[in-house]
């Protein structure tokens, strides 16, 4: 378990702690105490707050959930937070978050124990056809605890565990890359900017793992993955700056899709820009897409940003992006994600 209260002391379902209840009305607090005692709990009141020690988080949430339903009929609104007794900092979680956490015990266990691995998808240099890097993609490490990465991150976000999962996935990717890749091979690793509230603090553990595993920082490329609008560009610029101060490269993913615009590319000035598949798919048959790609490449060239075409699934797409002047490419036509890295070069023979 991590020791940072923001990135997540993660209470397990068996962890002991105290639930803190509040109600606006004095009569409401009396009613809460009565209901808790009727359920076998031993509440203690301190001002407007009612403290109830529990043997486990799971027990607490199930009792509070039932209590909430009972009191709703009396018109009393209950607010509850959990404080886990094992935390050095004390970790406060509201009832809604706790309900999410116990809704999928297997997901909580996966995050708590890091029960996942990574597959690698090759990225080629279009000028030399050599494999210059691998993107790391989270996958289950066993059939016992299976998950879809998107669903796991969605659960983590609702359960207030997104920072924990993002940090674990980032560090695990670095460790995995140290075992499988030679020095000089770029390692493209996703990160969620919303999970990093203070770059200098939150990224210490990442840089520690880099050093421990002897990974050259210049071989790392951390790429922004964000499904929601970036409201604080200055914060993201600060994250990029922190990475680059340590010699790490940065990339902006999904260009041309959603909020990852060319204007954002020019504001952030990453080392790499990854163009979304929506612009690459059948670009050989779409002159409008080709024109958009040309303009994107021109503006990237001004800032010396290397451009990567994602989602290449056909030979014709590969040929077009190469002719247009893309530096790099990635996709199923080149190579699918795998446990082990693809060979050092790419050939179209037999494709």
Predicted regions and their residues:
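Active-site core of bacterial EAL-family cyclic-dinucleotide phosphodiesterase domains
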Residues: 95-154, 337-338
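Glycine-rich beta-to-alpha transition loops that act as phosphate-gripper elements at the mouths
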Residues: 123, 253-259, 306-315
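Conserved, mostly hydrophobic/aromatic
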Residues: 129, 169, 173, 189, ...
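Catalytic-site-adjacent helices and loops of nucleotide signaling machinery
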Residues: 149, 158, 252-265, 318
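Surface-exposed amphipathic alpha-helices with a cationic face
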Residues: 210-211, 237-249, 294-301, 322
